[in-house]
Amino acid sequence: MIKQRTLKQSIKVTGVGLHSGNKVTLTLRPAMANTGVIYCRTDLNPPVTFPANANAVRDTMLCTCLVNEEGVRISTVEHLNAALAGLGIDNVIIEVDAPEIPIMDGSASPFIYLLLDAGIEEQNAAKKFIRIKQKVRVEDGDKWAEFTPYNGFRLDFTIDFEHPAIGKDVRNYVMDFSAQAFVQQISRARTFGFMKDIEYLQSQGLALGGSLDNAIVLDDYRILNEDGLRFKDELVRHKMLDAIGDLYMAGYNIIGDFKAYKSGHGLNNKLLRAVLANQEAWEFVTFDDKQAVPHGYEAPTQVLI
């Protein structure tokens, strides 16, 4: 049986909030089987919890933001959520003493290290997957995203920015998902932004924690980071990272083929909602026989970083 997974022990880290620029303490705790991924703001009294849920995603302008019925929000969850998806962690309590998850270095890599440091433990309950049964597509102008059936989790993402530093040869990335592939090919890809946009955001009191230490920054002609890129196609890889985090808001790893063109947090969430709203388009599956598990979802015994 492919089993659910949680952490062996609690672990804590501090970082900076992307929008506030303030120090944030993040604590990850093990959770019982069938708990799911639960975000919790401990800076509020009483603390407010946000189960990872596609319908709780409201504000997707700059990041993925969960909002509850009272309008309380927690922001910038997508990179941590992607790390949880990458390592197949089903049950975890995520506590943060601020309105946002710390940005760390702008990628999912610090969260991968954190999760592996805590250790991963199998639980005595079957892991549920969402299997795509029929095509679902959403569009917004020339942007689109779709799921089709596939025995695994395949991602094909294309970006389209007219910029001298973003050539046509670095605008598409395709990956067959596995924990190893995610860690090595996707997790280190950092978020990116354009200098003119960042300056405007900071004038509005946003992105105050944004810097060359936690983002790739481009002016009108070039990349400003002295160390350059971690991959020549780091930008599209990061958009794939975002998508993996956004789609894990379902609370379950997905078995299907995901394709996207110029998609972002909003369209990723729109696709996920469209899938879940159509009972004919998906089903829950579990695997008693490990041999029957789709490629990439075999429980990894170890992950090489």
UniProtKB/Swiss-Prot annotation:
Its EC number is 3.5.1.108. Its cofactor is Zn(2+). It is an enzyme of class 3 (hydrolase). It comes from the Bacteria. Zn(2+) binds at H79, H238, D242. The keyword Secreted does not apply. The keyword GTP-binding does not apply. The active site is at H265 (proton donor). GO terms for molecular function: metal ion binding; UDP-3-O-acyl-N-acetylglucosamine deacetylase activity. One of its GO terms (cellular component) is membrane. Pathway: Glycolipid biosynthesis; lipid IV(A) biosynthesis; lipid IV(A) from (3R)-3-hydroxytetradecanoyl-[acyl-carrier-protein] and UDP-N-acetyl-alpha-D-glucosamine: step 2/6. InterPro entries: Ribosomal_Su5_D2-typ_SF, UDP-acyl_GlcNac_deAcase, UDP-acyl_GlcNac_deAcase_C, UDP-acyl_N-AcGlcN_deAcase_N. Belongs to the LpxC family. Catalyzes the hydrolysis of UDP-3-O-myristoyl-N-acetylglucosamine to form UDP-3-O-myristoylglucosamine and acetate, the committed step in lipid A biosynthesis. This is UDP-3-O-acyl-N-acetylglucosamine deacetylase.
